[in-house]
Amino acid sequence: AAVPSGASTGVYEALELRFRAPVEPY
């Protein structure tokens, strides 16, 4: 999981784990 330039790190981490998609949040 890439490190998003924001404070919503846990949110993107959860989404990546749930959907299992190689999505890179910006």
Swiss-Prot record:
It catalyses: (2R)-2-phosphoglycerate = phosphoenolpyruvate + H2O. Its cofactor is Mg(2+). Pathway: Carbohydrate degradation; glycolysis; pyruvate from D-glyceraldehyde 3-phosphate: step 4/5. It is found in: Cytoplasm. Mg(2+) is required for catalysis and for stabilizing the dimer. Homodimer. One of its GO terms (molecular function) is phosphopyruvate hydratase activity. Disulfide bonds: none annotated. Belongs to the enolase family. One of its GO terms (cellular component) is cytoplasm. This is Enolase. Keywords: Cytoplasm, Glycolysis, Lyase, Magnesium, Metal-binding. Its main location: cytoplasm. It comes from Populus euphratica (Euphrates poplar). Its EC number is 4.2.1.11. One of its GO terms (biological process) is glycolytic process. InterPro entries: Enolase-like_N.
